[in-house]
Swiss-Prot record:
SMART domains: CYCLIN (SM00385). Hyperphosphorylated. GRR1 preferentially mediates the degradation of hyperphosphorylated CLN3. GO terms for cellular component: cyclin-dependent protein kinase holoenzyme complex; cytoplasm; nucleus. This is G1/S-specific cyclin CLN3. It comes from the Eukaryota. G1/S-specific cyclin essential for the control of the cell cycle at the G1/S (start) transition. CLN3 may be an upstream activator of the G1 cyclins which directly catalyze start. Required for budding and for cell cycle progression and morphogenesis in environment-induced hyphae. Degradation is mediated by GRR1. Through binding to CDC28, controls the phosphorylation of SLA1 which regulates cortical actin patch dynamics. Interacts with CDC28 and SLA1. Keywords: Cell cycle, Cell division, Cyclin, Mitosis, Phosphoprotein. It comes from Candida albicans (strain SC5314 / ATCC MYA-2876). InterPro entries: Cyclin, Cyclin-like_dom, Cyclin-like_sf, Cyclin_CLN, Cyclin_N, Cyclins_cyclin-box.
């Protein structure tokens, strides 16, 4: 390596970055400096995220009209993608952005059953390019080996073009983790109530960690994910965390604080006259009360205690970074929810002691919650083939053999409609795909190669009804 070559300079930068990353004091100083600078633009950031969010929402009614893709197949794909993200050590925002790209594409194009995994990995590839470091972005060979040679390298490039064209090159979308960070910083920098700000600041790490865990869990449940926006999911996750971890903050007051942000003059100063992005509140009190009920808490216990296998690997691995803390948080949350559902009977003497403690610590009782019969279904279980698994050794192996498969018919272009407008897939024109890009994918030595684990790629992510 030449001393003045770009590679030499890159190695020096990598070495300096590793030295800085190992210096905890330097990291703390940089974080405080970053927080102080960002604090000045928090309202502008909130307005921008809410404005972009309204333009990048998927359409559930169109996704349900998919002829081959069912909502029951979705958790299998997301579980597979989360496992890939965990093994490749990608950023936290990569997963929610990948899910957003998949759902938005399914809202505009018909997706074949055998192309569902291809769509998921390509969306993950696009998200990596936007959010992760260059050296973490998987190559085409890596993608091919991750899916156990189910697709050719050229098909990922072809699918990437279709996704970008279908989404009109609008890739970035606000994710729930971005809102969680912003909500936490807004509350910590709240000058009107220093007591609450100090309480949140002391528990900010636990609040962010457990809120992100709940937000990732909600991605697997369509009736939560599609009924609420990313900003609302982030707020619901924070409220659940404050409730279950027994942080002494009133939930209604916390909800009113966030809803009041969009009514301040500082926030409204960012809204142009005549603009469509007028926001009255983030999550209404009625929506909050209708969601936080006994039925929801019962299912929330099941969701928290029984996460998908990929989230178990990410948060509860034996040598994981947050495994001990997450186990403590999950145990505390489950016990709190069980106490809410079945409160422990107490004696009159114990009640008088509790009242004395509440008066001494200025405890504010939580408001009563309405009860209805809405329920959250458990994660669907597949009786058929699950997504092809892989290991890190497979990704970087030198074997370049690829089994021959048929690409099939590509998803057609949809007619242009306004966002949220219901339409039928019967009015979609078929997209003609040139045979030059597909005919060249045949293998010369097809007879000498063996197929990988799955003998029929058409059954990937298929749930028997």
């Amino acid at each position: 390596m030449f001393p003045n070559s770009p590679d030499a300079f890159h190695q020096v930068r990598m070495m300096q970055s590793s030295i800085k990353a190992s210096n905890f004091k330097l990291q703390s100083m940089e974080f405080r400096c970053h927080s102080n600078n960002v604090c000045e633009y928090q309202m502008e950031m909130l307005h921008h995220l809410l404005s972009v969010e309204a333009k990048t929402l998927p359409n559930l009614s169109l996704i349900e009209q998919q002829p081959e893709i069912k909502l029951g197949m979705r958790p299998l794909l997301l579980d597979f993608l989360m496992e890939v993200i965990t093994i490749l050590s990608l950023s936290r925002s990569t997963f929610p952005l990948t899910v957003n790209l998949i759902d938005r594409y399914c809202s505009t194009r018909i997706v074949k059953k055998q192309h569902y995994q291809l769509l998921g990995l390509t969306s993950l590839w696009i998200s990596c390019k936007n959010l992760d470091s260059k050296f973490k972005v998987p190559t085409l060979n890596d993608l091919r080996k991750i899916c156990v040679d189910s697709y050719y390298k050229e098909l990922f490039v072809e699918m990437e073009k279709h996704i970008l064209k279908s989404l009109e090159w609008v890739v970035n979308a606000p994710t729930f983790d971005a809102f969680i960070d912003l909500y936490s910083n807004l509350l910590i920098s709240n000058s009107s109530n220093f007591e609450v700000a100090n309480i949140i600041k002391k528990s900010s790490h636990k609040i962010k960690l457990f809120s992100n865990y709940i937000g990732e869990l909600f991605q697997f449940y369509p009736n939560i994910y599609y009924d609420y926006t990313s900003s609302q999911i982030a707020l619901i996750a924070i409220l659940i965390t404050v409730l279950t971890l027994k942080i002494p903050v009133d939930l209604i007051s916390l909800l009113n604080f966030y809803n009041g942000l969009v009514k301040t003059e500082m926030f409204k100063s960012n809204v142009e006259q005549g603009a469509e992005d007028q926001f009255e509140e983030i999550l209404s009190v009625d929506s909050f009360k209708s969601l936080f009920n006994k039925s929801f808490f019962k299912n929330l216990i099941k969701i928290i205690d029984n996460p998908p296998s990929s989230l178990k690997i990410k948060y509860f691995a034996e040598n994981g970074k947050y495994s001990v803390l997450m186990k403590q948080l999950v145990t505390t949350a489950s016990n709190t929810l069980k106490c809410i559902l079945d409160p422990v009977p107490t004696t009159p003497k114990a009640n008088s002691f509790v009242k004395h403690q509440q008066q001494q610590h200025h405890y504010h009782p939580r408001p009563p919650m309405s009860i209805n019969t809405s329920m959250i279904p458990l994660t669907p279980v597949s009786n058929s083939t699950s997504p092809n698994r892989f290991s890190p050794d497979q990704i970087f192996s030198e074997n370049e053999s690829t089994p021959g498969i048929a690409f099939g018919t590509m998803t057609p272009d949809s007619q242009s409609t306004s966002p949220g407008e219901k339409r039928s897939y019967e009015c979609i024109d078929e997209l003609e795909i040139g045979t030059s890009t597909i005919a060249g994918y045949t293998l010369k030595n097809h007879d000498t190669l063996k197929r990988s684990k799955s003998a029929n790629y058409g059954t990937l992510f298929y749930l028997q009804q």
